[in-house]
Amino acid sequence: MMADSQPLSGAPEGAEYLRAVLRAPVYEAAQVTPLQKMEKLSSRLDNVILVKREDRQPVHSFKLRGAYAMMAGLTEEQKAHGVITASAGNHAQGVAFSSARLGVKALIVMPTATADIKVDAVRGFGGEVLLHGANFDEAKAKAIELSQQQGFTWVPPFDHPMVIAGQGTLALELLQQDAHLDRVFVPVGGGGLAAGVAVLIKQLMPQIKVIAVEAEDSACLKAALDAGHPVDLPRVGLFAEGVAVKRIGDETFRLCQEYLDDIITVDSDAICAAMKDLFEDVRAVAEPSGALALAGMKKYIAQHNIRGERLAHILSGANVNFHGLRYVSERCELGEQREALLAVTIPEVKGSFLKFCQLLGGRSVTEFNYRFADAKNACIFVGVRLSRGLEERKEILQMLNDGGYSVVDLSDDEMAKLQVRYMVGGRPSHPLQERLYSFEFPESPGALLRFLNTLGTHWNISLFHYRSHGTDYGRVLAAFELGDHEPDFETRLNELGYDCHDETNNPAFRFFLAG
């Protein structure tokens, strides 16, 4: 806030937030970002699609707005003591950049598994980095402890009125750039951006609908709305890490509950497809959470048959790990419903694959994985190009069933898409008493060694597959030879502390890998 104004606190009303947004001095650090028409997508979806380019900020995300708004309102005494926060991503860079502009010392606590590119970016903006903890929660606990011990001011990533007001400046720009919008789609992690955008728009132009978009595997706002209060998610997804928040903020929830018009969730494949749309239309390379709002917009348009409207979405960030783009490229066809993945049983005789392809009626086969395992039947993993999306996929399934083939649709099977497709043909030569688990490993030195020391010396590992996706965590698929009752194994899993899920009954595993 300006020197002659009082920072917000408590639970301000909408009018108070409006005044705070108007007074927020964010442009001492942030920029007015363009609102750009997506020509190709507008034509394809029969709506005017506009993108708010927050990737053009100095830190390549909207987080700078909220961080600077709060830090600029600190007292001289608070500034002298410095600030502290915990983050593995965009908020860390926003705080570091703001601290340099304000001449305030900033300590950013980041999990030890944080990618070097993110650590280097924070240091490049002038922030001091402390690597601590295996995850965000441990890093946050350390930051709060240091705040209390050394007098730092804690700068939260979303749940503070001044942070929310700072994010609300984006909405003010949006209305100044186009006052004829019908709907605005906003990504949600902790809710700071959604709260700020919604409260501002509803004060000035309440006829504009504000729709929140969440990742299906990190939908903390939806869970809170369903429960009537903020709740903890048992786990969050890793792909859209910028919105991977287990619990919505208290103040952000209060505002979202009051001012949002609707909410929609999308899966990772839809996010990948939206990232492709942004690149092809405006040559923006968004991070997954940055493309989240567009993914939700596309799904919302399809669900509600929207035509002829002016729709804006927020490209919230572009701090993407380059190595993660391989994963995006692989998955965007599925997200656009342009590919079907199928497990099909065909006779193990010459010409059977030719007959199968002929039945597909000239459709392109995008992927075919097979290895001889049985003299009578072959299980194949096949990808088929689609031109008419889900409707065509259903037609293919029906056609194959009518043709006498046993077929399982794996297009929505996460394990099949992530790992099994690269392992087809690895059946053991004899039956095994094995159980299959998927794990999320931190991408840090010693993670694999810890896994093997905890589990690999006590039980035989009969299958193992790891693949990096360019995020702070990797995905591992591992099978263990276990007896009928192995209580010690469950104990060891808990000791390991990695997020894991039993995948033994997964159809892709049964088709292609199980003994």
Describe the function of each predicted region.
Residues 1-447, 451-515:
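PLP-dependent amino-acid enzyme catalytic core
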